[in-house]
Amino acid sequence: MDKEWLEVCIYTSSEALEAISGILYNTGVKGVSIEDPKDIEFKKKHPGDWDYFDETLLKVKDTAIVKGYYKEDDKFNEYLDYIKKSVSNLDQFGIDKGEGLVEVHKVNEEDWENNWKKYYKPTKVSNKIVIKPIWENYDKKQEEIIVELDPGMAFGTGTHETTRMCINALEKYIKEDRTVFDIGCGSGILSIAAAKLGAKHVIGVDLDPVAVKSSKENIKYNNLDNIEILEGNLMEVVEGRANIVVANIIADVIIFLTEGVKAFIEKGGYFIASGIINSRKEDVIKKLEETGFVIEEVREEGEWVCIISKIN
């Protein structure tokens, strides 16, 4: 008989997904899944990339959903109170929490461990890069570069606007014999894409040991030997400079990192910063320019922004 678990559903906005995921990771959550309507709309517009699409998902096109999975124990009510209060307080940090509704349901272990996989199919995210889950088959076209990925439930599937913009920027700016640093590497998707696009050496860093483990596993799936994954922050665990530093995080962290990051970029190198909500674009640009970066280009997709700046 399948074990029963408690599923906490938070109905929110795309803007608040990362913040709410962070709230859940501060509790005893055993798994997190994300349903982002922006990803769903993207997949509907690119039907050739999918061999399965559940039209019922479009019924929640204005609502993003974060689900956390818990064992039923003495601490659950404490976790639930913390989640509700933290979600309620997001407005104080300038984050649109959307509906902000929190619900609890009982589910079987099988339901949450594997069902999410059926919605995750190979997706072309740039001119060359196709993100392919490791359990799917895909007929590669001649010019395509395949990134094999098992994101697990803790990380995005690589189709979010912020990730797509980063990959497209890497595709444009990476040249042979270049070094790339990936800050907050998560599943390793940007590090892997950078290596497959021709970077000579890639270093990915993340403070989360789960991310470090996930990145290393995904690198093995792609048979790459020129990527190094380190646990910690860039300033403490990495030596040397890169031609490109990429960070797909959030605006406040990018602003905080900007001065330190400058010392890790070669003259003439680029800082690709994404994960920035449109309302924070000018704040990030201002900080970059104050620090000596020259804005090369600003890309926008939906409510998200990717800023590419340069050290001259």
Curated annotation (Swiss-Prot):
SUPFAM superfamilies given in the database record: S-adenosyl-L-methionine-dependent methyltransferases
Function description: Methylates ribosomal protein L11.
Gene Ontology CC annotations of this record: cytoplasm
Gene Ontology BP, a term: methylation
Family listed: Belongs to the methyltransferase superfamily. PrmA family.
CDD domains: AdoMet_MTases (cd02440)
Gene: prmA
The keyword Methyltransferase appears for this protein: yes
Enzyme Commission (EC) number: 2.1.1.-
Tagged with keyword Transferase: yes
Subcellular location: Cytoplasm
Pfam families cross-referenced by the UniProt entry: PrmA
Catalyzed chemical reaction(s): L-lysyl-[protein] + 3 S-adenosyl-L-methionine = N(6),N(6),N(6)-trimethyl-L-lysyl-[protein] + 3 S-adenosyl-L-homocysteine + 3 H(+)
InterPro entries: Ribosomal_L11_MeTrfase_PrmA, Ribosomal_PrmA_MeTrfase, SAM-dependent_MTases_sf
Protein name from the UniProt record: Ribosomal protein L11 methyltransferase
GO molecular function, one term: protein-lysine N-methyltransferase activity
Domain of life, source organism: Bacteria
Binding site for S-adenosyl-L-methionine: T163, G184, D206, N248
Gene3D superfamilies: Vaccinia Virus protein VP39
